[in-house]
Amino acid sequence: FPKLPSYQAFCRRLNRLAEAFAALAEVLFEQKLADAEPTHGYVLDSCPVMVSVGSRSNTAKTARKLCNLTRNPTRNLWYHGVKLHVFAQLRPRRLPIPCAVQISKASLCDLWAAKQIDLDCAPVTDGRLYADRAYIDAEWKAHLQAERNITLITPRKRKKYDTLVSEDAVSTHISALRQPIEVFFNWLQAKTHIQSASHIRSCAGLLFHIFSSLALAALLLRFYY
């Protein structure tokens, strides 16, 4: 088979399609949002895309322009990679629909990333935005209310030795309202393995991995969910 390309050449061709997959995902998500009834309820969160984990993450050099080292408190592990930040519109008894998606270095504060997304494209307006404690910020909350007509709702940050049971109930309720975004991330991982990127060897490869995964998820969400 003298005319077959090498494996490296084939990978390079695939990696060049990253921007096309990003555009495809954007179009499909926008079509799904246009077809869905507005609920005026939104969620915000992030998930890790891990290029290297554990002891290997300390010496990882892959895609350093995009990736760096940080600790994931939920999983209690260190990883080298990026974060995927998502604003999504809630739907009753269905998966939420992403309104905006952005990647950042793994160590970037979730709040800063959310502020940048809001500044870039104002993905949500007129409603309630449910988020976890990482997004507690009085100034940003006031900005969202004044500029976007969005009420930012987060669990109460408990003070030391605070035992107010009523506030615990409120936080539990807010966590339940945020549950669909966790379900979405679990579904996305099950369908695409987007969080598992140990096979990645370059920035271009990482972008292809992320955007092709999002394009597949958008396609499934558009026609089957």
Where are these regions (language model features)?
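Short alpha-helical elements
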Residues: 1-225
